[in-house]
Structure formats: structure tokens, C-alpha cells
């Protein structure tokens, strides 16, 4: 059986990535890095033939794992994707909050938390 996110007819690929913010405790920064990591080494040269309407018809579903106690600016996550329609950005508790073992106020640190986010990015139509 094949599944698809709500509003999708077909999923063409699903990729995962991870991103981190070692200084500043910004989960949004970690999340956008995770999304870029998920898509940055992919190329779909035949997208115009695979997706009805080409890039304009492409749909993107994002699922993030963010450490407990941190929030994400979903609009900033949407801005990562240069093509297609981001139909949803789901955020679950997950990822990792660990320690960088140093606090650098000049980097925006408010402690030594090191935030790691995971992302699953699905592309289809």
C-alpha cells in the first residue's frame, strides 16, 4: 500500500534531514537548516513531466521533530522552499536538546543548549 499526506494524489519522494543551532537556542534556525539539508542534494530534472502543472503543481509536506520547550516559526520554514506549495508543516516533539558546553553571549546564547531538529520533506502532487 502507498500512502500520501492530505491533499496529495501521489508522493514522488520523501527525504529527511537534520539541522542544529549550537548557539542562540533558536529552534527555527535548526528547523530551516534541517529542511535545507533534506532537499539540498536532490534534483528532479523531470519534475515538469512527473507533476501536472510542473513546479506550480508541486506540493510539499514538512514534518519536523523539535525538542520539548522550543517553538518554530512555520512561515520561516515555508520560505526554505523555492518551488511548489507547502501544504502543511507539522511539528511534533522530538529532535534533541543537548549541550554545547559553552555559552557565548555574542552569539545570542542564553545558556549552553544545543538544539537539533529533524525534518521529513515529502514532495508530490
Segments predicted by a language model, with ranges:
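A generic local secondary-structure boundary/capping motif
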Residues: 2-3, 49-52, 78, 103-112
Amino acid at each position: 500500500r502507498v500512502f500520501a499526506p492530505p491533499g496529495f494524489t501521489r508522493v514522488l519522494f520523501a527525504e529527511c534531514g537534520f539541522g542544529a543551532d549550537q548557539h542562540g537556542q533558536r529552534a527555527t534556525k535548526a528547523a530551516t537548516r534541517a529542511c535545507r539539508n533534506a532537499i539540498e542534494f536532490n534534483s528532479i530534472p523531470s519534475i515538469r513531466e512527473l507533476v501536472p502543472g510542473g513546479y506550480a503543481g508541486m506540493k510539499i509536506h514538512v514534518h519536523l521533530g523539535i525538542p520539548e520547550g522550543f517553538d518554530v516559526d512555520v512561515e520561516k520554514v515555508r520560505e526554505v522552499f523555492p518551488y511548489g506549495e507547502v501544504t502543511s508543516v507539522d511539528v511534533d516533539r522530538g529532535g534533541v536538546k543537548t549541550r554545547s558546553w559553552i555559552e557565548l553571549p555574542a552569539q545570542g546564547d542564553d545558556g549552553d543548549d544545543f538544539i537539533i531538529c529533524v525534518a521529513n520533506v515529502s514532495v508530490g502532487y
